[in-house]
Amino acid sequence: MVMITLINNIIRLINSYNSGKNICICIYSKISMLLLGILIEKKIIKSFFVLLFKNKKKIFVIIKTIILIKLFSKPSNKRYIKNKYLKKIEFNNGLIISTNIGLLTIRECLKLKIGGKIFFSII
């Protein structure tokens, strides 16, 4: 269920950017907050804030730029990677991996020497 929420939020960000909007409303979850924190570090979004809207929490995201986001793992097709294969990946700057600690970039996974499920890449 968490995977569907994250994929839905990423697709919402891409669609709102492609339609020319700077603000996107996303579904609130703790892992979505981790994802948005990583996207701020990568300078893809400017900022985000949480508001209570009709007794439900929503995340309002201000988008800066989205170059290209490619989803690897889907609910029906999960792709895992071990620690020893992380160094062989060519586009190691924008790969986001879901681990037992949470969502991490590939550089953080190399420092901690852990693998996980490949979630998406930012190209």
Swiss-Prot record:
Which stretches are transmembrane?
A: none
Q: Identify the keywords attached in UniProt to this record, alphabetized.
A: Ribonucleoprotein, Ribosomal protein, RNA-binding, rRNA-binding
User: Which domain of life does the UniProt lineage start with?
Assistant: Bacteria
Instruction: Please give the InterPro entries that the UniProt record associates with this protein.
Output: Ribosomal_uS8 (IPR000630), Ribosomal_uS8_sf (IPR035987)
Signal peptide, first to last residue: none
Keyword match DNA-binding: no
Keyword Transport listed: no
Q: Which GO terms describe its biological process?
A: translation
What GO cellular component entries does it have? Answer: ribonucleoprotein complex; ribosome
Could you state a single Gene Ontology molecular function term?
structural constituent of ribosome
* Family annotation (Pfam families): Ribosomal_S8 (PF00410)
Could you tell me what this protein does? One of the primary rRNA binding proteins, it binds directly to 16S rRNA central domain where it helps coordinate assembly of the platform of the 30S subunit.
Q: Which family does it belong to?
A: Belongs to the universal ribosomal protein uS8 family.
Q: Note the subunit structure.
A: Part of the 30S ribosomal subunit. Contacts proteins S5 and S12.
- This one is known as Small ribosomal subunit protein uS8
Q: Which organism is it from?
A: Carsonella ruddii (strain PV)
Lineage of source species: Bacteria, Pseudomonadati, Pseudomonadota, Gammaproteobacteria, Oceanospirillales
Gene it is expressed from: rpsH
